[in-house]
Amino acid sequence: MIYLDNSSTTKPYDEVLNVYEQTSSRYFGNPSSLHRYGAETEQLLQAAKNQIKRSLGLKKYDIVFTSGATEANNAALKGAALSKIKTGKHIIATSIEHPSVTESLEQLKELFGFDITYLSVNEDGFVSIEDLKAAIRPDTVLVSMMHVNNEVGSVQPIEAAGEVLKEHSNILFHVDYVQGIYKVPLAIEKAGIDLCSISGHKFHGLKGTGALIVKEGTRLIPLITGGSQQKGIRAGTEHTAGAVSLAKAINLASADFDTRLDTMTAVKELFMNRLSEIEGVVINTPQMNSAPHIINFSVPGIKAEVLLHMLEEQDIFVSTTSACSAKEHKPSKVLLEMGKGEQIAGSSIRISLNYSQTSDVAEPFMNALRPGIKKLREMMR
């Protein structure tokens, strides 16, 4: 079995599973309780926060544990926008954001009258900093920009955007860091980011674990109320075992990061080179400034789902669009925004790698893909 759908989810590390089970069994107290079991659990929860902050180089930030990045994005965007509603009602985002961002913004537009400006991207999936500058208005209160696009892997100019926004202290800066964390380095504090979303199951943690990284002094209107937990940003008894497992996954992902990054980059380049040799294959991932784990390509004339299931028959698992949108059977919105056209957008396949995979995965993939494409083309004549 060759699993090449790691941008959708990754297999949890054994150590993460073990620490989750141990924490659930030994530290079952409610962190808000005043007795010893509560105090011990609260200390463990705080230790998990501190470990995450150390690993990510954060000093002036707090960690709000969430059920994942979808919740973190919702909490960040809605919480920030509603906290600023008396100041202004204009928000800027890119046109290729994850649905948890775009649908949150559209909800703010529909329910509260916010005006949303979506920055277009070029053919490689990059936004223009000049477009960002031009879009800023006196009533702009929030900018949201994903770090790494989840479909094609383009890396947005977050640091440059942060420099622009430092000149506008009234504007909050949110970054969806889900596909970038421990794939593409990002100095969160240096970039001037106010809110940053991460998800544990994208780097061998557990589903249902994630966090919103919040800069000190950033005010958010809570989406979940009913308690003072997590400084009132997210009410409800904290999922201590989930938080500890997230910290463990981050700790493991950070170990020997540079070496593993080099390996992943080499495997990606091998895939890109081999795919470019196949007649009719269009590579959608940009050659420069793209993440080391994502390769997106299209075979115009062959539907993505058909190609996906053909590979599945060979025990090779890939994906089409974002996993959150895959069952809609629509052409990739990201590729359409990049100007690729319906044929390319409707036939795109995403390969996404994990830390442990080497060049050994490329050969069996190509051995299945080449004859598979040939067979499908012959059937369509």
From Swiss-Prot:
The keyword Plastid does not apply. Pfam families: Aminotran_5 (PF00266). [2Fe-2S] cluster binds at C324. It comes from the Bacteria. Pyridoxal 5'-phosphate binds at A69, T70, N150, Q179, S199, G200, H201, T237. It is an enzyme of class 2 (transferase). The keyword Metal-binding applies. InterPro entries: Aminotrans_V_dom (IPR000192), Cysteine_dSase (IPR016454), PyrdxlP-dep_Trfase (IPR015424), PyrdxlP-dep_Trfase_major (IPR015421), PyrdxlP-dep_Trfase_small (IPR015422). Keywords: Iron, Iron-sulfur, Metal-binding, Pyridoxal phosphate, Transferase. The active site is at C324. Its cofactor is pyridoxal 5'-phosphate. Its EC number is 2.8.1.7. One of its GO terms (molecular function) is iron-sulfur cluster binding. It catalyses: (sulfur carrier)-H + L-cysteine = (sulfur carrier)-SH + L-alanine. The modification N6-(pyridoxal phosphate)lysine is found at K202. Catalyzes the removal of elemental sulfur from cysteine to produce alanine. Belongs to the class-V pyridoxal-phosphate-dependent aminotransferase family. NifS/IscS subfamily. This is Putative cysteine desulfurase IscS 2. It comes from Bacillus subtilis (strain 168).
